[in-house]
Amino acid sequence: MADKLMDKNFEELCYSCRTGDMDNVDRLISTGVNVNSVDKFDNSPLFLASLCGHEAVVKLLLQRGAVCDRDRYEGARCIYGALTDTIRDTLLSYDISKAVDVKQPFATHISSMYNDEGFLKRDITFRVSNGKLFTAHKFLLCARSEILAEKMVNEWAKHEIVSLEVRPDIFDIFLKFLYLIPILHQIEPGQYEELIELSSKFDIELLPEFLDKARHTADPTEKSRLMSDYQYKFTEVARSQLLIFVNNCIFRSTVDLANSERRVFSLMNCPAYPDVQLMVKNRNGAIRIYPCHLAVLSRAEYFKVMFTNNFKEKVTYIKAKHVTGKYNSIIPQLTLPNCEFEVAEIILRYLYADNTDIPWMYAVDVLLLADILLEDRLKTIASTIITQSKEFIQQYNVFDVLYLSWEIGVERLEQFAAKFIAIHLQELYKDPEIKRAIMLSSQRISLRQETDTIELVDDIRYYLLRKYSFEPDDVELFENQDDLEYLKQVGYLEYRKDMGMLDNILADLELDV
């Protein structure tokens, strides 16, 4: 079943690369689909985007791990089949040793945690052979290695500082790898053996395999290709591991409270090693507490701003850390805006593991919550789910979608609604809501630099042309034609009927546009 879903996602990815739908390409890549696979015609997503001239999509694919090696057949096809010189230059100049996921929001955030010393968010310290200290996040180490997780519970449980007999340069590379920092090209020949030993000791998935291959590869081009292939795999493994951590350690450690119930509970022995509690209240008034981590929640601008400025949450967090120490039983509490628990868990899966699996029935709630959290990428993904779900439009009114797009400023939804209205204009013509929508759109003119056009009307007219596959010049030619049979065959008469309906609505509203 999972393979069929992945095949479907890959087919959809190829289609979106042909059409240039960058938002959907972004969403589909986040499902874990292999960007370097090929379709039944032996076309890769990168080749399709290059061939069709979608430069932004080409750059996105390269940033997410797509490989373009001119020494390979597929890479040569991408370069020489590029529609524009700009795309060709981009492909030629892209160093395959840099073709990693460092610009992917998920990998970027995990990497940033390594250098973020703010607010005492790290909760474990390692002392290596020369006495140098390294700090890290317990939850991340537990997610990345079952052996590390076991040691946290057992032999390291009561240690504030864990001593390891390992060289500092080896442990530095090891930790950076766990934090998805691209350090593969920095590994020196004399470091391979100890890195293999350390990563094998803690059963770090794929790393010993890569290191063994890399140390036996002398050709720089081959080594760069190997790094590119494995860096993509490493990121996908990390996403999978963090998703398992969220499902097994966070969601299974939640505390449910009845409406307005207040009772003391401890998350001290929680396997998630949280440093904040996230409180969520659903529509029925039930409350659920999620053990979370500020280092991850701050990926959302809402929480980042909260702790960048001197809000009470920041003061409480720092005070709790200093007063009760690293192993505090009382941890600060943050509140998520009221929503269903399923929606909160979609948000958490996204923040922790970049998971974008959003069932259509929750897409609107996710969209609204993402807007509050100032998480624009998640807004885009949720809106993409809405516009591509047949079930959604069967359950929701298109005008509700339109008003939602205005409320939270998502152009994709606005265009979707206008296109739907244009396609179904003859069915919606007598619906009073269409007049209300146009009138509301006309009142938004002052927000759009005082123009004499109405945006919704302009969009409907545009999609009416698209509905009948016309260009503006075609309409001018048809207006001078007298052959009714011909005009009927090409669809011009139906087009005029639709345009007449739209003009009648505008006349009823006394709008001259």
Curated annotation (Swiss-Prot):
Q: Which PANTHER family match?
A: ANKYRIN REPEAT AND BTB/POZ DOMAIN-CONTAINING PROTEIN 1, ANKYRIN REPEAT AND BTB_POZ DOMAIN-CONTAINING PROTEIN 1
Native organism: Saccharomyces cerevisiae (strain ATCC 204508 / S288c)
> Which regions form coiled coils?
none
Q: Which UniProt keywords apply?
A: ANK repeat, Repeat
Per UniProt, residues of the BTB domain are 122-179, 274-360
GO CC terms on record?
cytoplasm; ubiquitin ligase complex
Question: What is the name listed in the Swiss-Prot or TrEMBL entry for this protein?
Answer: Ankyrin repeat-containing protein YIL001W
Return the InterPro entries for the record: ABTB1, Ankyrin_rpt, Ankyrin_rpt-contain_sf, BTB/POZ_dom, SKP1/BTB/POZ_sf
Q: Where are the ANK repeats?
A: 8-37, 41-70
Q: What else is known?
A: Present with 195 molecules/cell in log phase SD medium.
